[in-house]
């Protein structure tokens, strides 16, 4: 059997950003409106700093406005909530993202709930979570949305397919399951307590791995020809002391069985920022009561 088709997230996300750039230009020309994304970073976490820099760069590249607010790690919770309140009221800001994790003295849920749901481009606010569950027009979390776009690009219509989502986090697992239900898949949500996890995975046409355990899902768990979306990003140390990024799927064995698979890195990762920009554009159009943006 030949190796699985590689699902190239870099290529797809680049095309999506091109489309977003064109839609932003159209919005500016027709309505004199420029979408704006505000990113708030509290503290000095190195990984978060890289993410924020990349988000800012990509935002500007698409023709949107980028507003960065970098706060010291000891910023009081009230001060952060006041900043969010001012961004909620700012007509030039259409998307608000607070980079997670925040320092321990700040209540993450309180921060999420302080963001105007119409500007919640992470899709974490309970209003957006509820709308997604009810099948309404929600701003959808970026990683599940990116995963869904890759799936639809690879498979076309998803209706009737059996899908397993391994992981039940609020950020990936739960919203991913809701998106697949909306696409008329038959969805199983599996996790650490699932009995016979390999057997459950083996029945699935679509496997979404979002469990946060390096290379946990083995090739012999996968149904031949299945499509595998690996959301995991884990840094492991090799015997020679060097470090390597791997997913939640054992790529070397899975690539020999699956029909299509996302690599790590270069699969789902690049889609996350592209979908953040997509959400910002969608939020901007809705806030200004413009027609829904087509991608």
UniProtKB/Swiss-Prot annotation:
Record-linked PROSITE patterns: THF_DHG_CYH_2
Family annotation (Pfam families): THF_DHG_CYH, THF_DHG_CYH_C
The reaction(s) this protein catalyses: (6R)-5,10-methylene-5,6,7,8-tetrahydrofolate + NADP(+) = (6R)-5,10-methenyltetrahydrofolate + NADPH; (6R)-5,10-methenyltetrahydrofolate + H2O = (6R)-10-formyltetrahydrofolate + H(+)
Tagged with keyword NADP: yes
UniProt cross-references to InterPro entries, sorted A to Z: Aminoacid_DH-like_N_sf (IPR046346), NAD(P)-bd_dom_sf (IPR036291), THF_DH/CycHdrlase (IPR000672), THF_DH/CycHdrlase_cat_dom (IPR020630), THF_DH/CycHdrlase_CS (IPR020867), THF_DH/CycHdrlase_NAD-bd_dom (IPR020631)
Superkingdom of source: Bacteria
Record PANTHER family: C-1-TETRAHYDROFOLATE SYNTHASE, CYTOPLASMIC (PTHR48099:SF5), C-1-TETRAHYDROFOLATE SYNTHASE, CYTOPLASMIC-RELATED (PTHR48099)
Protein name as catalogued: Bifunctional protein FolD
Phylogenetic placement of the source organism: Bacteria, Pseudomonadati, Pseudomonadota, Alphaproteobacteria, Rhodospirillales
């Amino acid at each position: 059997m030949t190796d699985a088709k590689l699902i190239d997230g870099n290529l797809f996300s680049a095309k999506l950003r091109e489309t977003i750039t064109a839609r932003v230009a159209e919005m500016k020309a027709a309505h004199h409106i420029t979408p704006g994304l505000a990113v708030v970073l509290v503290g000095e976490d190195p990984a978060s700093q890289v993410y924020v820099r990349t988000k800012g760069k990509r935002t500007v590249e698409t023709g949107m406005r980028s507003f960065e607010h970098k706060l010291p790690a000891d910023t009081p919770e009230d001060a952060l909530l006041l900043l969010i309140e001012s961004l909620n009221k700012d007509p030039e800001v259409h998307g608000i993202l607070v980079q997670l994790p925040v320092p321990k003295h700040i209540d993450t849920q309180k921060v999420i709930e302080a963001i105007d749901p119409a500007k919640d481009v992470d899709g974490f606010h309970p209003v957006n979570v509820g709308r997604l569950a009810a099948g309404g027009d929600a701003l959808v979390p970026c990683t599940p949305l990116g995963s869904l776009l890759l799936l639809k690009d690879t498979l076309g219509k998803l209706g009737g397919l059996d899908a397993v989502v391994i992981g039940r986090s609020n950020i990936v697992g739960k919203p991913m399951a809701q998106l697949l239900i909306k696409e008329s898949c038959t969805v199983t949500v599996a996790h650490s307590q699932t009995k016979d996890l390999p057997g459950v995975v083996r029945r699935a046409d679509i496997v979404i791995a979002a469990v946060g355990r390096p290379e946990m899902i083995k090739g012999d768990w996968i149904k031949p020809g299945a499509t595998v979306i690996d959301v995991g990003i884990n840094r492991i140390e090799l015997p020679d002391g060097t470090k390597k990024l791997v997913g939640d799927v054992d790529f070397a064995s899975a690539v020999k069985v699956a029909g299509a698979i996302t690599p790590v890195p270069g699969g789902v990762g690049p889609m996350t920022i592209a979908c953040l920009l997509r959400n910002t554009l969608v939020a901007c159009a809705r806030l200004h009561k413009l027609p829904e943006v087509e991608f």
